Design a protein with these regions (language model features):
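Active-site signature of alpha/beta-hydrolase-fold catalytic machinery across serine-
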Residues: 19
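The conserved Walker
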Residues: 9
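Hydrophobic anchor at the beta1->P-loop junction of P-loop NTPases
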Residues: 5
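Hydrophobic positions on the alpha1 helix immediately C-terminal to the Walker A/P-loop
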Residues: 16
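NTP-dependent small-molecule kinase module
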Residues: 23, 128-178
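A glycine- and Lys/Arg-enriched "phosphate-lid" helix/loop adjacent to the NTP-binding pocket
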Residues: 88-135
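Conserved lysine of the Walker
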Residues: 13
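Conserved nucleotide-sensing/catalytic segment adjacent to the nucleotide-binding pocket
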Residues: 29-82, 88
Length: 178
């Protein structure tokens, strides 16, 4: 089973990816850990792509969370058996990011590179509320959903996420993935 978890910042991609990895006992790659070096420094693109390719090549099953179009995006979508798109509204994402900040203040969360302390600055708030939701970005999301429609699950709120997770409870066979 290969699962891609995409969506807006603060929507819960990493948490869902971790839960799916635990449920199906398959490795999880958080693309934030690939992209960032300690101190919020960006890695060289080719090194990032190489790490993602190596992860995908060495694992028959995986969960990968994060958007990062330059990091084997087309390959991830093509190889995925299931794509989950976290389409939560901007205010829900901001609230979730704020809660995450309070939970991890002064340290890195487990889905982030060590040395990248959790932050909620004006730049990130702007990203959550506006910059990640441009017409161009929405057009790209629509294209992904149309191209990969039959294997895409769109979750728009916590109730849908809870229902989705409930539908998975007790399943140990990834081929039964809804």
């Amino acid at each position: 089973m290969k699962i891609v978890v995409n969506g807006y910042s603060g929507s819960g991609k990493s948490t869902l990816a971790r839960r799916l990895g635990e449920l199906y006992q398959i490795p999880v790659l958080h693309l934030d850990t690939v992209h960032w070096l300690p101190g919020w420094e960006e890695k060289a693109e080719e090194q990032e792509r190489s790490e993602v390719r190596a992860f995908m090549d060495r694992n028959a099953s995986w969960v990968i969370d994060g958007n990062y179009r330059k990091l084997e995006y087309e390959r991830r979508l093509q190889e995925a058996d299931r794509i989950i798109f976290m389409d939560f509204n901007r205010f829900s994402c901001l609230f979730r990011a704020y809660r995450r900040y309070l939970d991890h203040k002064g340290r890195a969360r487990s889905s982030m590179t060590e040395g990248c302390e959790e932050k909620l600055d004006l730049e990130f708030i702007r990203w959550i509320l506006w910059d990640s939701r441009t017409r161009k970005q929405k057009k790209l999301w629509r294209a992904m959903k149309e191209t990969c429609g039959e294997k895409t699950v769109v979750l728009k709120n916590q109730r849908q996420l809870d229902g989705f997770l409930e539908s998975l409870s007790g399943q140990k066979n990834p081929t039964e993935f809804p």
